[in-house]
C-alpha cells in the first residue's frame, strides 16, 4: 500500500480536493480517503498527520458523519477544518449548535496566541468562511488560538497533542494565508519534508510498472491528449520494448485530430503507433442514445472491446494502460460523503469484466501535476499544454443523439473557435475551450429569409487542476468575431451563446 505524508478524510466538502492540492504544491504528498476509512487502513498508510475536511452535515444531526474515534489516539497531529473542527469539538464534549448568524464569504480573524499553524504569519488576516453551525464552548484541554467577529472560538487547539481546529477554509484562494497555514501544519506539527515532486514520482512509478508488468506486454491507449501522451512517455521510460501504443479513431474526434496524433507520436515522440478506425462501430452503438451516462458507458465498453481485439493480435499482452487522473477517480466514485458527479469513460464507464488488467500510473495526481510530469519526461510544451479533450470526444459535447450531421456541424464551429483563440493569444491563457451543440433550435433572420437552425454554446474556462474552474473573461470583440464567423461560415447554425457558469456548481463539460 502506498504511503502518504498526510491523510485527508473526506466528509463531503466541495473543497476537499483543494486541501490535497495545496499540500502537494508544498512538496508534501497528501491523499484523500473516505471519512469512514478503517483505523487499520489509516495505520497502513503510515501518515505523519491527519486532516478532517469540511462537509455539509451537522455533528448533532441523526445523519451526521463520524470517523473512527481511534484517530484521536494515534499520537498523530490532527487538523479539523469547518465540519472537521466541529467534529473535534463534539468528540471532546463541547457543544455544537446552529449558528444564529450564518457565515458565508470573507471574514477577518485575529491571532490570540502564537502557535505552529500561524508561525511567521500576520496577527490579522482575511479568511473564507462557509458554515451554518458554531462551537458554543471550548473543548476541555484546548485553548483559543484565534477569534473572528462572529466566533470567539474561530481557531482552537491543543499544542501538546498537536490538535488544531479551524472554522474557516484555509484551502481556498480567498483565505489569504491559507496555503501557509497548511504548510505550517505539515512542517511544524507533522514534521513533513517537502520532498515530493514529479521527478521522484516518475522514478517511483517506473519502478512500479517494471515490477508489476514483468516480461508481459502493455497495450497503451492514447488519444493525443496530454494524459495519454504522458502515460505513453512514462511507459516508454520504464519498458519501451514491451509497449504497444494504440490510437482508436472512434468517429468522435475533432477536425484533423487523427492526423495530428499520428504525426505527434511518430515524429515528435518517436513512438510507433497503431491506428485503428473504429468509427462505424462507435457511431452505430450511439444511435438513438441521448442520456449522457449511457453515452459514456457505451463508449467505455466499446473502447475496451476494440483494445481487447487488438491485444489478441499480439503475444503476451496482459495489460491496458490508461491516462486516468485523480480527478477522474474522484468524479466517478463516491469518496467519503461526496457524491458521484459523472462516470468517466475510463473509470465508471468501464465494463465490470475485462480480459486485460488495468495500469493507471497517473491516477494519484492532478492535471497540473501531469503537465509537470510530462515536462520532466521530456515532452514538448506544445504536447504538455494542449487543452484537455474528453475520452468520449464530441459525443458529450452534442446534447441529445449523436450522428454524422451533428458531428460535422460541431467540428466546423470548434475549428473557428480555436482559430480565433490561437490567433489572439488567448488559447494559451485558458484551461479549456470548446463548442457545445445544443439540442434546441431557434428562429433567426439571414438576408430576408427566416431561419430555424441550431444553437451553439461556447465554453472557455480558466483553471489550475480541473477540480474548480471559472469562465474566461474573453474580450467582447473576440466573442463577437467567434459568433460572427460561426454563424456566417457554418450552415445550420444561427445562434451562438457563451457559458458563464463556474465549476462548481456546473461541471466543465456539459455531459
From Swiss-Prot:
ATP binds at residues 223-229. PROSITE patterns: GATASE_TYPE_1 (PS51273), GMPS_ATP_PPASE (PS51553). One of its GO terms (molecular function) is ATP binding. Pathway: Purine metabolism; GMP biosynthesis; GMP from XMP (L-Gln route): step 1/1. Keywords: ATP-binding, Glutamine amidotransferase, GMP biosynthesis, Ligase, Nucleotide-binding, Purine biosynthesis. It catalyses: XMP + L-glutamine + ATP + H2O = GMP + L-glutamate + AMP + diphosphate + 2 H(+). It is an enzyme of class 6 (ligase). One of its GO terms (cellular component) is cytosol. Its EC number is 6.3.5.2. Residues 196-386 form the GMPS ATP-PPase domain. The keyword DNA repair does not apply. CDD domains: GATase1_GMP_Synthase, GMP_synthase_C. The active site is at 82 (nucleophile), 169, 171. InterPro entries: Class_I_gatase-like, GATASE, GMP_synth_C, GMP_synth_GATase, GMP_synthase, GMPS_ATP_PPase_dom, NAD/GMP_synthase, Rossmann-like_a/b/a_fold. Catalyzes the synthesis of GMP from XMP. This is GMP synthase [glutamine-hydrolyzing].
Amino acid at each position: 500500500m502506498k504511503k502518504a505524508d498526510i491523510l485527508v478524510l473526506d466528509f463531503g466538502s466541495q473543497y476537499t480536493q483543494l486541501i490535497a492540492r495545496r499540500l502537494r504544491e508544498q512538496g508534501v504528498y497528501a491523499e484523500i480517503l473516505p471519512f469512514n476509512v478503517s483505523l487499520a487502513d489509516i495505520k497502513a498508510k503510515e501518515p505523519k498527520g491527519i486532516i478532517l475536511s469540511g462537509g455539509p452535515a451537522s455533528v448533532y444531526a441523526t445523519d451526521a458523519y463520524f470517523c473512527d474515534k481511534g484517530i484521536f489516539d494515534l499520537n498523530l497531529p490532527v487538523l479539523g477544518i469547518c465540519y472537521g473542527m466541529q467534529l473535534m469539538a463534539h468528540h471532546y464534549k463541547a457543544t455544537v449548535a446552529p449558528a444564529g448568524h450564518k457565515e458565508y464569504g470573507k471574514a477577518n480573524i485575529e491571532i490570540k496566541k502564537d502557535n505552529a499553524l500561524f508561525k511567521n504569519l500576520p496577527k490579522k488576516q482575511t479568511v473564507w468562511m462557509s458554515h451554518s453551525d458554531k462551537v458554543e464552548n471550548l473543548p476541555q484541554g484546548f485553548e483559543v488560538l484565534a477569534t473572528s467577529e462572529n466566533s470567539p472560538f474561530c481557531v482552537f487547539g491543543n499544542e501538546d497533542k498537536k490538535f488544531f481546529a479551524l472554522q474557516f477554509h484555509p484551502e481556498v484562494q480567498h483565505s489569504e494565508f491559507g496555503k501557509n497555514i497548511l504548510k505550517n501544519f505539515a512542517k511544524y506539527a507533522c514534521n513533513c519534508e517537502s520532498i515530493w515532486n514529479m521527478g521522484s514520482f516518475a522514478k517511483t512509478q517506473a519502478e512500479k510498472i517494471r515490477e508489476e508488468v514483468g516480461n508481459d506486454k502493455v497495450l497503451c491507449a492514447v488519444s493525443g491528449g496530454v494524459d495519454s501522451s504522458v502515460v505513453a512517455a512514462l511507459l516508454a521510460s520504464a519498458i519501451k520494448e514491451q509497449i504497444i501504443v494504440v490510437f482508436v479513431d472512434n468517429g468522435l474526434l475533432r477536425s484533423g485530430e487523427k492526423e495530428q496524433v499520428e504525426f505527434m507520436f511518430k515524429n515528435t515522440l518517436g513512438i510507433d503507433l497503431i491506428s485503428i478506425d473504429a468509427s462505424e462501430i462507435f457511431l452505430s452503438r450511439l444511435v438513438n442514445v441521448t442520456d449522457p451516462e449511457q453515452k459514456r458507458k457505451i463508449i467505455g465498453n466499446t473502447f475496451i472491446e476494440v483494445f481487447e481485439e487488438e491485444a489478441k493480435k499480439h503475444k503476451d499482452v496482459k495489460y491496458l494502460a490508461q491516462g486516468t487522473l485523480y480527478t477522474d477517480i474522484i468524479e466517478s466514485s463516491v469518496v467519503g460523503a461526496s457524491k458521484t458527479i459523472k462516470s468517466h469513460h475510463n473509470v465508471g464507464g468501464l465494463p465490470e469484466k475485462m480480459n486485460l488488467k488495468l495500469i493507471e500510473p497517473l491516477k494519484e495526481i492532478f492535471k497540473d501535476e501531469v503537465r509537470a510530469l510530462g515536462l520532466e519526461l521530456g515532452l514538448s510544451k506544445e504536447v504538455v499544454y494542449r487543452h484537455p479533450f474528453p475520452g468520449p470526444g464530441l459525443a458529450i459535447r452534442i446534447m441529445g443523439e449523436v450522428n454524422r450531421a451533428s458531428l460535422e456541424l460541431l467540428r466546423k464551429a470548434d475549428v473557428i473557435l480555436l482559430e480565433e483563440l490561437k490567433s489572439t493569444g488567448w488559447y494559451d491563457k485558458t484551461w479549456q475551450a470548446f463548442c457545445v451543440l445544443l439540442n434546441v433550435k431557434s428562429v433567426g433572420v439571414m438576408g430576408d429569409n427566416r431561419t430555424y437552425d441550431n444553437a451553439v454554446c461556447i465554453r472557455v474556462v480558466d483553471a489550475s487542476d480541473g477540480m474548480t474552474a471559472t469562465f474566461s473573461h474573453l474580450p467582447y470583440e473576440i466573442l463577437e468575431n467567434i459568433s460572427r464567423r460561426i454563424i456566417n461560415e457554418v450552415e445550420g447554425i444561427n445562434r451562438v451563446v457563451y457559458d458563464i457558469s463556474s465549476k462548481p456548481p456546473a461541471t466543465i463539460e456539459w455531459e
